[in-house]
Amino acid sequence: MLRNTHLVLPFILYLLFRLSHFLLEVPTVRMIELAACHQHLRLDHGPLNEAACKTPPVQEHVSLVVGWKMTFDSIPGLMSILYFGTLADKSGHRAILRLCCVGYLLAILWVLITCLFHQVFPVELVLLSSLFLFIGGGQLVFAAVITAFVADLFPPPSRTKFLFLLAAMPHMDKVASPALATKLMEQNLFLPSLVSMAIVVICVALLQMSDVGRETAASKVVGSTSDQTEPFLRSSSNSSQESGTAAPAIDPEQARGPFRQLKNIICWVHREPVLFICYLCFFLKSNAMASEAFIFQYLSEKFGWPLRETTVMRLALSSGAVISTLIICPLANATLHNRGVASARINIGAVHASSIVLVASFIMAWQASSSTAFIFSMLAAGFGEGLEPALQGVLAAASQTKAKGSIFALMCTCSLLGDMTGGPLMSALMSIGRGGNGVSDGYCFLASALVFGAVIVLAHLLWALGAEEMLGED
């Protein structure tokens, strides 16, 4: 029973922690809107009609605060993820996960207090909630550490199957959270925040009561298989393989001056080409997926849907992703492994297949002539969400190390950088075609298809770099 608890608990933690985040997406905006509206109308208390808050000055104020909050919330994770990833390798995963929960709990509490007592605090003070995310690093660090823990917990033959299941957790939250948040907001606007805080407290309690995430947890659960390393894509230097740790990307003793740093980066790419390609794929995947942020606007603009009804796009995307990562990919992975197919062949095959699905889906979205075709294209795009866990399986095998916290921390950093650069790029492409009161031509979806085409090429390159090792890794 204890063994099964160790196996299941990381998935429960990830499901709950991500639910606490998605549950607050809409309520947080509404709380900020309410506080800003009271400030603009100079009302200290009493009921306020939501329609009165839809004036341009109030909405501009809300957009400014929400936009800056999103930016500030990403800074702690970006600045601290490598530190916490390395610390997780040294101190165990549980301590870092607990820190993430504490910091996020304080951030939720700060926003709640600021908006609840809007007659005392200016709404701009919600931006200070981002400071609490330096305690643990927030959602980004939690995702990196829990992924590293699952990768450490399971042996190579079954690792990717469980990474698929882990990837399904946030997609399940995306399906359930809108309806749950709506029901809670109907009772009280501040109730979703209280429920989210309770969920985070449950996560802390689960971490405190269990041994999950301790440094020795993987060896206790996996047994002798935890000492195995996959002879997959042996691009690491001999010294890094012998020591059981991944060679650092940049030597801190030698990284002095821009030319020396550039030289070290080039040497690392030459020494660890597979890791470099994996990180590049994570960057490109996040960059391409940035176009998904515009699907609601595109459905409303091109096909005349009311914006409030475009939430069906979230349901289509998440439903496809849940079916893919929870059912199709794990079953395919287990079936192929039982037939003796090497794990690395399965992983790279999943990267290749998922990328093809995404290319076809985004081309279909670009060429969609009806709202039904567009919705179907996004449902199909959800089936391509197996790309990320498949890449995680390749990365875990290629890292040649038991301490994967820093490896997956860098992975999340690349994904975040992809999000940050993809947003402005896709926004600019989305604006093409609007001249002369026209509608967008949807070139952002074509760009996404082209980027995923590049990922297909990189998947072939991964195969070329390690075909001999892959055929005999298991």
UniProtKB/Swiss-Prot annotation:
Pfam families: MFS_1 (PF07690)
Annotated GO MF terms: transmembrane transporter activity
UniProt GO cellular component terms: plasma membrane
Region (Disordered): 220-252
Transmembrane segments: 7-27, 64-84, 101-121, 131-151, 162-182, 189-209, 276-296, 315-335, 346-366, 374-394, 406-426, 445-465
Compositionally biased intervals (Polar residues): 222-244
InterPro entries to which the protein is assigned, alphabetical: MFS, MFS_trans_sf
Keyword terms of this UniProt record: Cell membrane, Glycoprotein, Membrane, Transmembrane, Transmembrane helix, Transport
Role played: MFS transporter; part of the satratoxin SC3 cluster involved in the biosynthesis of satratoxins, trichothecene mycotoxins that are associated with human food poisonings. Satratoxins are suggested to be made by products of multiple gene clusters (SC1, SC2 and SC3) that encode 21 proteins in all, including polyketide synthases, acetyltransferases, and other enzymes expected to modify the trichothecene skeleton. SC1 encodes 10 proteins, SAT1 to SAT10.
PANTHER family recorded: FI18259P1-RELATED, ZGC:174356
Remaining remarks: Trichothecenes are sesquiterpenoid toxins that act by inhibiting protein biosynthesis.
Family: Belongs to the major facilitator superfamily.
Protein name: MFS transporter SAT21
Source organism: Stachybotrys chartarum (strain CBS 109288 / IBT 7711) (Toxic black mold)
